[in-house]
């Protein structure tokens, strides 16, 4: 009886310590993101939800990215035209089956303006479908690249979309 009580107390204390630790990490990440945006208000902030990312042919690490709240990579770029390339991933659930979707290396040209925040990610719906679903309350679409992906016998449509926050 006493042994099971110690085990339960041990796991509760362990859970509490881990919970507090992760809350501190999340809080620090959020503060860092806010500080990053305020320190770079004269640049374009770009949230990249992709891997193997290159900007103008250079590795993403050359641009000193930070990790955002959703584990995306965030960079501050001086205004101008950029070629951004990367491999985009997402998942979809169909009939209780999870399908992992991954693009090839996609390259796109974007004109970025100072003081704006952009997000580039893969979505399973078009900008028009999202705008209809959100009753027109969506960010401005800067670029949309439709993809057709065939996984086994399933037909999947996906889009790489760049949104500019309003």
Residue ranges with predicted function:
Residues 1-76, 87-166:
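Short loop/turn and low-complexity linker motifs enriched in small/turn-promoting residues
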Residues 80-84:
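A short tyrosine-centered beta-strand micro-motif
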């Amino acid at each position: 009886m006493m042994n099971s009580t110690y085990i339960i107390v041990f796991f509760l204390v362990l859970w509490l310590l881990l919970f507090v630790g992760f809350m501190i990490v999340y809080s620090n990440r959020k503060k860092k993101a806010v500080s990053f945006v305020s320190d770079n208000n004269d640049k374009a902030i770009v949230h990249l939800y992709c891997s193997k990312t290159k900007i103008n042919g250079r590795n993403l690490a050359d641009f000193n990215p930070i990790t955002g709240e959703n584990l995306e990579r965030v960079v501050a770029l001086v205004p101008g035209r950029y070629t951004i390339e990367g491999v985009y991933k997402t998942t979809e659930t169909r009939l209780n089956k999870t399908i992992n979707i991954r693009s090839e290396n996609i390259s796109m040209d974007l004109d970025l303006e100072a003081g704006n925040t952009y997000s580039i990610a893969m979505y399973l719906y078009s900008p028009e479908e999202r705008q209809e679903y959100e009753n027109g309350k969506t960010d401005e679409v800067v670029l949309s690249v439709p993809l057709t992906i065939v996984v086994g016998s399933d037909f999947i449509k996906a889009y790489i979309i760049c949104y500019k926050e309003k």
